[in-house]
From Swiss-Prot:
Name of the protein in question: Ribosomal RNA small subunit methyltransferase A
Residue runs in coiled coils: none
Superkingdom per UniProt: Bacteria
Compartments, as annotated in UniProt: Cytoplasm
Length: 288
């Protein structure tokens, strides 16, 4: 089928299939072929690459990825969209459609099963996704903390979420999501995407980011789960000093004071001023 990345073709498909885009699932379809090409180029996809696409929608980006990649695995949760995808992607032998919830998918097992390799011999692969707001943080946590064999992710997210992922200590957008993303990856902006290139048109603009997965985290911690508990505690009550915010972890104040002193951190500082190494230092000292 011809490209669906045009307003006319997308609208025709929506009407033909009787589709009602669900706002609750962030179903805003990309209708600009130029943006589609830019996203695919950013992923640097070649004939030797396997790409997993989350939420392919009507298949606009899937079609472009399939023209470049060796294999595209597209995961779609919506049954009606899945049926439409079977038509828009017909004839593309290097595309595998998977009906399911990406939050519940073991990506390594899925890719290994389709490639016919054991998980121990699985090559790295890439992830491309247009993530709706409601699923951005949960899916990122699933993809990054599971330590799947992902080399890089190219994600389109709401602009405000993208800026949170990129934010540095002291900035208004800096938070727990910033720390998680930068702990596991090196994020970079690919392009800004105006709301006008979607149907239906969303209320906000989007940002495409490229997250290059680190071979090892940017800081060393003994217990990642505890490290992220410290991070979440620091940001859950942003107006509190780091001394008081960490009280939610259940430690005596004297223990927290000792940990902060050991890390060389003024207890009057607030969580949003702390860098990655400072959070790592706090988590290490609190555990001993």
């Amino acid at each position: 089928m011809d490209s669906v990345a045009t307003p006319g073709r997308t609208l025709a498909l929506v009407r033909e299939k009787g589709l009602v885009p669900r706002k609750s699932r962030g179903q805003n379809f990309l209708v600009d072929a130029n943006i589609v090409r830019k996203i695919a180029r950013a992923a640097e996809v070649g004939p030797g690459d396997t790409v997993v696409e989350i939420g392919p929608g009507l298949g606009a980006l899937t079609q472009e990825l399939a023209a470049r990649a060796g294999l595209v695995i597209a995961i779609e949760i919506d049954r009606e969209l899945f049926a439409a995808l079977e038509e828009t992607l017909a004839g593309r032998d290097n595309v595998r459609l998977v009906a399911g919830d990406a939050l519940k998918v073991d990506f390594d097992r899925l890719v290994a099963g389709i490639l016919g390799t054991g998980e121990g011999r699985l090559p790295t692969y890439k992830v491309v996704a247009n993530l709706p707001y409601y699923i951005t943080t949960p899916i990122l946590m699933h993809l990054l903390t599971s330590r799947f064999r992902i080399a890089e992710l190219v994600l389109m997210v709401q602009a405000e979420v993208g800026y949170r992922m990129l934010a540095r200590p002291g900035g208004k957008d800096y938070g727990a999501l910033s720390v998680v993303v930068q702990y596991y990856t090196e994020p970079a902006v690919v392009l800004k995407v105006p709301r006008t290139v979607f149907y239906p048109r969303p209320e906000v603009d989007s940002l495409v980011l490229k997250l290059t997965c680190r071979t090892r985290p940017v800081v060393q911690v003994e217990d990642e789960d505890f490290f992220f508990r410290v991070v979440r505690a620091a940001f859950n009550q942003r107006r509190k000093t780091i001394l008081n915010a960490l009280g939610s972890l259940g430690f005596e104040k004297s223990k927290i004071m000792e940990a902060l002193a050991g890390a060389g951190i003024d207890p009057r500082r607030r969580g949003e001023t702390l860098g990655m190494e400072e959070f790592a230092s706090i988590s290490r000292t609190l555990q001993h």
